[in-house]
Structure formats: C-alpha cells, structure tokens
A protein has these predicted regions:
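Non-catalytic helical/linker scaffolds that mediate oligomerization, partner binding
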Residues: 1-471
Length: 471
C-alpha cells in the first residue's frame, strides 16, 4: 500500500470525467485547482466534475484551492512581446502605458515606494534580470542584466523583499468565498512569509464559514523559510513550492531547503508537500527522465507527506501516465526505506498527551509486528498525529465526518474510512477491527492496534490504545 500521497493539478488536459476517473484509479489522492488561471465559472465546472467522479467511485477525493497570492506582474505590450538586450535601459512604470522595448506598466501601484537603487527585479521566473538604477514618482529605471524575450503579463519577483500591505487581495477574498461556497477542503496560500499572513487567512476563513478548511502554507521566499516555526503554529501544512522559491533565492539552495522544510514539518506534525517540475518532461513525453525519477524518489526518501503534479496533469499530453509513474516511483522507493530504524532514531517533539499517545501507538504497532493501526477520530487529528511518525504499519483512519474523511486522504500512510457513530468504545473497536480485516486483508493470528476515545462523539477525546489479535 503506497503511503506517500499524490496531488494533481486539474486543467484542460484532465478536466473530463473519464480522465479524472482514470487518474483516481492510477493513484491520485487530492485535486488542486490553480486560481492563478481561469474564471469562477470554469472552476465551478471542474468542481462539479470532481464531485461527480468521487461520488461515482465512493472515493474521498478532496479539493485544494491554490490562491493567486500577492502576485506582481507586468502589463501588456503593443506587439505582445519584445526582445531586450543586455546592458540597455528599461523602465517599469505605475503609469498606464502601452509597452514597447523601453517601457512597460506594472500591476502594483505602490511598487516604486517599496524599492531602492541597486535592487534586482526578475521577470518570467528569473529568465530576465534587471537592476534598479533610478527611481522617480512613477518610474523604476533599470539596467538590463540578462535580456531576452519579454511578453504580456509575465510574473515579477523581487528577491529579498516582503512588501507591505494586506496579505489577501480582493481577488483572493473573492476566490476564497467561492471556495467556501463550493465546499473545498484545503487552501494552498501562495507566498506566505510569516505567521501574520496565515493568521489573516485563518481569520477570513473562520469569519465566512470556512472553519473546517485546512491551510497549506506555500513557502516561496526567504522569509517563509526563516519563519517556518511560527508559520507552522497556525498552518495545517506546508508546500515546498520550488518554482518561485528557486527564483526568490539562489536555486542551488533549493535542495537543502527542501530537506530542511520536510524534516521540520515532520518533527512538528505538519503535512508537507513537495511540488514543482517533478515530472516536467511528461508534459510532452510519455516517460520521465532519469533525473525526474530521482527527484520524486528523493522527495519520498525525505519524508514528504505528498508529492505534486502541476503542468504534467493540468496541460500535459499524458496526465494519467504521469500519475501512474509517480505512484510507481513512490511505492518502490518506500519499499527501500527502513521506517522502523528511522522511527527509533528520530527525536520527535512530544508536546502533549495526544503526541505521546500517537507515538506510543506507533511503537506498539512496531514492537508487536502489527499488520495495521485503526484509529477512530471525529476530526481526524489523532490520525494525522499518528501519521506524522511515519510508522511502517498501514493506518486506517475512521471518521464520521465527510470533510475529515476527504482531508485524511492527504495524510501519509492513511486509508480513510467513513463510519457510523458508536455509543461505547467496545462497539467502536469491534467495528474498527471489522474494517481492518476487509481493508488490510488480515488473517487469523494477525495483530492490530486500535486507538480511539471513550466518548466517540466528542472531538479530542482520544485516550485509548488496544492490542487485538484476529481470531
């Protein structure tokens, strides 16, 4: 049973019912909708299709809304694109102009006040580099350090800068309200820099009926890396968004930062996603490169909760094959990891009773050579806490909540199961063992670990571990 989960971005190549069904059957666990592209009407059609497929399959397929975030972009050119030469002068302006080879408008009115002479501006994911030479009230006059083709609406990055102002734009707020209305499960928040960004998002969701939506903080700049501990105090998970991260900081640092963030999240009990360009060549080719296979495998070795497909599944020629290849790479890699040794040598942070109980659950499962861990949890919190320890024993997460059932499909090593409410712990554990027998294909003599609470209708009541032997 594969433990590392797979997130797939849905786009023109994968929005149909047949393709979505095949992607689920090939290993997709979570769908991602990128709100940097498309209208609400287009996203609504995708959401309807996703819900239709998951109902047809009886599969807990959660929906992740990825926000635009504080995006900075150039506006348009007369001829849609221009070619800039190294060493020439080029101006970014807050005025409304029609762009040419010397000037282009930007979408952020306060940009001039945020920069200083000597700062660098990167355009189109760092392919073009500019250095600020002069600032006026409306213009940023630059020297072109690395030229090339520049075209309409390309992204801008400002390494080392965290701009002032509200984290959530009006466009983001509109998208979030749309997501709440359509029962999305996760929000992937772009360009999170600090705790305050996550707090602003959490408050907005809570005030508008999105209390049960989990926040995944996308780490895409130096501030996000530096502030990871405080970000994890509020965020429910982290995405290592290597695309913009490799533009905002020197790209040679990205592998080390990836490992650092994954380890940090595992120790703190947060879900962590490795994303961007994992099987990039499969946008055009039916098989991944050897380097891409190694990249996916290393993300699994590092302990990622999930790995993600972007353009490969949204706009590529081979979305189903990309999912299947990623699943096969992950499953084979997991077979070559000694999770028992890793469990005992890792110095986990144990902050409370639930942490201690979850750690003990894993230790008991390993020591008794159990074939499975079955956890009954209203909110899914206990299941996620057991998952954080990366126990080699398969985990079945039982819940009475549809939302928790779906969200558990992002947790490492967990098979989510919908269950009824039970009046006693004995009845709950009886049904838990029945579920385990079906899902884990247990036989007489197999041990399983059962974890739950005496008051099954009350979230946060987990206080019991039981060892059962199948008769």
């Amino acid at each position: 049973m594969r433990k590392t989960k797979i997130i797939c971005t849905i786009g023109p190549a994968s929005a149909g019912e047949e393709i979505l069904t095949k992607m689920c059957q090939s290993g997709m666990n979570v769908v991602r909708l990128n709100f940097s592209h498309g209208t609400h009407e287009e996203h609504l059609e995708k959401i309807k299709m996703i819900k239709k497929v998951r109902e047809k399959l009886g599969y807990p397929l959660p929906i992740m809304l990825d926000t635009k975030g504080p995006e900075y972009r150039i506006r348009g050119f007369k001829n849609r694109k221009e070619t800039l030469q190294d060493g020439q002068t080029f101006t970014f302006t807050t005025r409304d102009v029609s762009g040419d080879a010397t000037i282009v408008s930007v979408n952020y009115a306060a940009l001039v006040s945020e920069l200083k002479v000597g700062d660098r501006i990167l355009v189109n994911n760092g392919l073009l580099i500019f250095e600020v030479r002069e600032l006026t009230e409306t213009d940023i006059v630059c020297d072109v350090i690395a030229g090339g083709e520049i075209s309409d609406h390309k992204s801008m990055n400002f390494p080392g800068h965290v701009f002032k102002g509200d984290f959530l734009s009006e466009a983001d707020k509109s998208d979030l309200l749309f997501g709440i209305e359509n029962d999305i499960d996760f929000v992937a928040a772009s360009f999170v820099s600090n705790k305050e960004n996550v707090s602003e998002l959490r408050n907005f969701l809570d005030e508008n009926g999105g209390e049960d939506i989990d926040i995944i903080a996308k780490i895409e700049n130096r501030s996000g890396v530096d502030n990871i501990d405080e970000i994890c105090e509020i965020a429910d998970g982290v995405m290592v968004a290597r695309g913009d991260l490799g533009v905002e900081i020197p790209f040679i640092e990205v592998p080390a930062i990836q490992k650092y963030l994954i380890k940090k999240c595992r120790l703190l009990g947060k879900r962590v996603i490795t994303a961007t360009e994992m099987l990039e060549s499969m946008i055009h080719n039916p098989r991944p490169t050897r380097a891409e296979i190694s990249d996916v495998a290393n993300a699994v070795y590092d302990g990622s909760s999930a790995i993600m497909l972007s353009g490969e599944s949204a706009a590529g020629k081979y979305p189903v094959e990309a999912v299947r290849n990623m699943a096969e790479i992950a499953e084979y890699t997991e077979k070559n990891i000694d999770y028992v040794k890793r469990f005992y040598r890792t110095d986990y942070v144990i902050k409370n009773n639930l942490d201690a109980l979850s750690h003990a659950t894993c230790a008991m499962a390993i020591d008794t050579k159990a074939k499975g861990i079955v956890i009954s949890s209203i909110s899914g919190m206990t299941v996620r806490m057991v998952s954080r320890f990366r126990c080699p024993v398969d985990i079945v997460g039982m819940t009475t909540s549809q939302k928790a059932w779906r969200k558990l499909n992002l947790s490492w090593g967990v098979t989510p199961v919908m269950s009824d409410e039970f009046d006693s712990v004995d009845v709950m554990f009886y049904h838990a063992s029945r579920h385990a027998m079906d899902i884990l294909e247990l036989k007489s003599g197999d041990n399983i670990i059962l974890t739950g609470g005496q008051a099954s209708k009350q979230s946060g009541s987990t206080n019991t571990i039981r060892l059962e032997t199948i008769r």
